From Swiss-Prot:
Binds 1 [4Fe-4S] cluster. The cluster is coordinated with 3 cysteines and an exchangeable S-adenosyl-L-methionine. This is PqqA peptide cyclase. PANTHER family: PQQA PEPTIDE CYCLASE, RADICAL SAM DOMAIN PROTEIN. Catalyzes the cross-linking of a glutamate residue and a tyrosine residue in the PqqA protein as part of the biosynthesis of pyrroloquinoline quinone (PQQ). One of its GO terms (biological process) is pyrroloquinoline quinone biosynthetic process. Gene3D superfamilies: Aldolase class I (3.20.20.70). It comes from the Bacteria. It comes from Erwinia tasmaniensis (strain DSM 17950 / CFBP 7177 / CIP 109463 / NCPPB 4357 / Et1/99).
Amino acid sequence: MNPSESNVKPPLWLLAELTYRCPLQCPYCSNPLDFAQQEKELSTAQWIEVFKQARAMGAVQIGFSGGEPLVRKDLPELIRSARELGFYTNLITSGIGLTQKKIDAFAEAGLDHIQISFQASDETLNAALAGSQKAFQQKLEMARAVKAHGYPMVLNFVLHRHNIDQLDRIIELCIELEADDVELATCQFYGWAQLNREGLLPTRDQLVRAEAVVHRYREKMAASGNLANLLFVTPDYYEERPKGCMGGWGAIFLSVTPEGMALPCHSARQLPIRFPSVLEHSLQDIWFNSFGFNRYRGFDWMPEPCRSCDEKEKDFGGCRCQAFMLTGNADNADPVCSKSEHHGTILAAREQANCTNIQVNQLRFRNRANSERVNSQLIFKG
């Protein structure tokens, strides 16, 4: 496919997964299960070349992610380079390893936005989920420091069955920290979250209660002005139609892994597709011409019931990674869809959520030992 003859638009959003290294062990991490086998990382110069190519194609926003991007000592240089190229720059961090000195350096380099994640609203549960006794107080301190520096206060909480019932306390913490934007993102089941799904998926009753809490606080905050934006993301496991994943395959979003693999979404490396490397191909060639990025573009690839569905232009057939994880074939309709012949797997997961008694300490945490343990069990190693 020649780009000039294609109706494919260039990417707008670049996710730079700088590293898989991380001081925390969250059991819902979206990093690949075999991250312990993926130790190579692009150099500073290689990342900057990726930024230049993405910007030349028209990408406008970049997210620095991981792992924990703060472990990269060259982060200020990467931020500066991206900003000088004209990117809107966003740091996605746990806050562990962040210091006032680093905040100053990032601001001087031109960083536009910092998002800090929390595991819970109290120190005990936060420590249990993160695998760190000191994480909660560090997060509080750095959240306040980010706010004091003049950055928008942007917080992220991943919700699941073990913390969703404290949602009122989570929102109260956000108000206390004077948050401007809060993302209450119910667990999306990829990577380590999929491995731990039975112990993480909330029940429908929990979600109903949570939605009521969010609604109540939205009304309260609309009157008081305490919080500019409260985003509540529910799990698609309780929907009857799939999400339009990533705005369509290879349509808006481009992710580059620590070692340079280019992906149309950050979970796609688990698929039985050999995705190209930025060390071997230009981003232009990867985006427009590679097999991996064209594999699920458009609608021609779709089997039934997606091919004849009048909703296909809305959901694009759903998530290819979810179809692969739950059916073994990424071509299948996303099982979330009630039209899918595999929808029973979703119904079974909902029922399982009502019966499980898995506790936090029984979850499989994202650490090197567990990564090496599950690596041999993977269906496909990207």
